[in-house]
Structure formats: structure tokens, C-alpha cells
Amino acid sequence: MATPHINAQAGDFAETVLMPGDPLRAKFIAENFLEDVKQVCDVRNMFGYTGTYKGKKVSVMGHGMGIPSCCIYVHELIAEYGVKNVIRVGSCGAVHDDVKLMDVVIGMGASTDSKVNRIRFNNHDFAAIADFGLLETAVGQARELNVPVKVGNVFSADLFYSPEADLFDKMEKLGILGVDMEAAGIYGVAADLGAKALTILTVSDHIKRGEKLSSEDRQKSFNDMMTVALETAIKL
């Protein structure tokens, strides 16, 4: 039952799929966090894997960069493979003064300059939000693990190299915590298809302060994010 972009078979994916942007990060997660791992897809080198975490079946698959790419994979996973829960695990650039490098940010909502959700909603504004059950579970698991998290609005940008430098000041004023490129699209697809979605991000750089994580610190904060995501996945 392969799709144009996923060559997995029926039953290959768990009901919950963790999705980083980078397919090599998906491979890393599978090899370092899961047991009994099987690679289930590799079209366009967008790798997907299924294994177990603490005895529960969990899948991980890359979604690429940007809303158009992630929407393809999330749509096909939900519509064709019966996936119920999508948890994006990625990085973001902080814009808010209260957010610092290595913080874990959970996207309660996702603003965007993309038009995809307006197209989806007859040119009306759509409030792209996380599923509350996933959000509540993730926050609870973070507290149990003593992983500090910031919960709030993020901004999903179409342009990585944005010409609108003054927009970051407006984002901070409106309480936006950080910038990614996918959350709003994932929330839109999940809502449209009746699935649940959540975005958990690691702050890899601070856009306004020009700060960036070292490779060592990036890995440490990534591990915290992944543990929160996986502990959330097995509670669903």
C-alpha cells in the first residue's frame, strides 16, 4: 500500500510517530532510543523506522524542511497508514527574552506567514493548535523528568532567511517563544484529518541575541526533548 512518498506496508507504522525534520536524525533516534528497530521506508531518503520504547511500539520518520514537505508526509501517514498521533521533534530559534539556549519549547499554538491553512479553511484564519491531551501529557512528563519547558505560541516561517528583521520584535511583543518552519502545517493537517499533533522543540539559537549552541550542548538538549517526547508517546 505504498504511497507516492512512503514505501511502507500496511501495519508498518505505530499509531504514534515522532517526526524530526532531518531523516538522519530519525535514523539516530531509531538507533539510539528504540529497540527491535525495523526500517520501514526510504523513498527520497526520507527514512522511517518502527521499534519499541519501554515495550511500546513507536515509529519515527523525517518530514523534511518547511510546511509543504511536512504536510505531504503527515497527510499520508494519517490518511493511508492510520497514524493517530504525530509529535514533531525539532529545533527552533528563540525570539523571546525569557527563552534561552537549550530550553525545551512546547508549541501550544503556531502562528505562521504561510497561506496553507487559509487555503484549507476557505481563506479564513485557522487557529493552529496542539491537541490538548498530547500537550497535557508532555508537560506532565517533562515535570516528572525535571526537564524545564516553556509552553506557548511559536511561529512557523516559510522563509529561513527572512527579509523582515523587524518582525522578530513584533513576535516578542505578542509572546511568541520561537520560530520553526513546520508546526502550523502539521497542526492544520492533523485537524483536517481528525488526528492529534504536538510540537516539541529545542532552542538551538537565539535570533535576537545572535547566540548559538555548541554541538555538545545541542546533543544534550536534544536528548532532553527526545526523552519527553518518547515518555509522552508511551502514555498515549
Curated annotation (Swiss-Prot):
Q: Where is this site: Important for catalytic activity?
A: 218
GO molecular-function annotation terms?
A: purine-nucleoside phosphorylase activity
Active site feature: 205 (proton donor)
- Which of the seven top EC classes does this enzyme belong to? transferase
EC no. given is 2.4.2.1
Among Gene3D superfamilies, the record links this protein to: Nucleoside phosphorylase domain (3.40.50.1580)
- Report the superkingdom from the record: Bacteria
The record's Gene Ontology biological-process terms are:
purine nucleoside catabolic process
Keywords carried by this UniProt record: Glycosyltransferase, Transferase
Naming one, the record's GO cellular component terms include: cytosol
Write down the chemical reaction(s) this protein catalyses: a purine D-ribonucleoside + phosphate = a purine nucleobase + alpha-D-ribose 1-phosphate; a purine 2'-deoxy-D-ribonucleoside + phosphate = a purine nucleobase + 2-deoxy-alpha-D-ribose 1-phosphate
Q: How does it assemble?
A: Homohexamer; trimer of homodimers.
Record-given protein name: Purine nucleoside phosphorylase DeoD-type 2
Q: Gene behind this chain?
A: deoD2
